[in-house]
Amino acid sequence: MAVQGFQRRLLGSLNSTPTAIPQLRLAANQTGARCLEVSIPDGLFLSLGLVSLVENVLVVAAIAKNRNLHSPTYCFICCLALSDLLVSGGNVLETVVILLLEASALAARAAVVQQLDNVIDVITCSSMVSSLCFLGAIAVDRHVSIFYALRYHSIVTLPRARQAIAAIWVASVLFSALFIAYCDHAAVLLCLVVFFLAMLVLMAVLYVHMLARACQHAQGIAQLHKRQRPLHQGFGLKGAVTLSILLGIFFLCWGPFFLHLTLIVLCPQHPTCSCIFKNFNLFLTLIICNAIIDPLIYAFRRQELRRTLKEVLTCSW
């Protein structure tokens, strides 16, 4: 958050666009050319952030309440929800402070606002990195449960899961602090982009491998029932659609933000890149949308968690 102009920022000086207003318009870049700028209303941004907060708080509360959910798999899901909660919470807090400063309802010295901005940036950046890590951890956990089913409980133990979780959080905080301190260095930005691509490749390879194994299993069952082609093809199509949705949402929600970082390194002054930079708030909103979708994909589809969630909502503690 810059004191002058009260700009919504996520990672230090990465964004130089003004606070969003509720419209879709053509904006002029530095050369006078026209480019498309999608502006996000503050009310919409806050609403999405609050929805994400509520969803992920419910996931964390449900897993904490039910001891049957204290397994490595649910620990990773809980940490993913906590990461998404912090992503949404940090951005909601930053936006609220900006609006209060703009309305002169909050008086603060420039140094205090800058320190608050730095804290929010570290929290938001570390939670974004940890969110990506836990998405990868969930994929690895599922892969082990399928390909090493008989040895799963000896491979993925609760102590090992806790060690992995602690390592992810520590690494995320350290990396975010480094990233905030040296965000003007191209190497740091590229490291973050490479990290995103690595997570994308990891998830794609693991889930495609799992889909192939599931199709083989379905084919074997179909052969026993002499229904090889209809059952196998139907299962394969359903699995491919599910996989496409999972990876598509991940890429759609996270990809534009990392494209933004890549273009900062490759073409910071190019007119076309300048047009893309103007949509920073849209890219940030897509990440908030991902924080809303994650519980629907990884948490609410599980019957035991849904049952516990009903108990939480009815306050039957």
From Swiss-Prot:
Topological domain spans for side Extracellular: 1-37, 94-118, 184-191, 267-279
> Could you mention a single GO BP entry for this protein?
adenylate cyclase-activating G protein-coupled receptor signaling pathway
Indicate where this protein resides in the cell.
Cell membrane
Indicate yes or no for the key word Glycoprotein. Answer: yes
Kindly indicate whether the keyword Transmembrane belongs to this entry: yes
One Pfam family this chain carries? 7tm_1
Q: Which domain of life is it from?
A: Eukaryota
Residues annotated as glycosylated are 29
The protein's predominant localisation is membrane
Could you tell me what this protein is called?
Melanocyte-stimulating hormone receptor
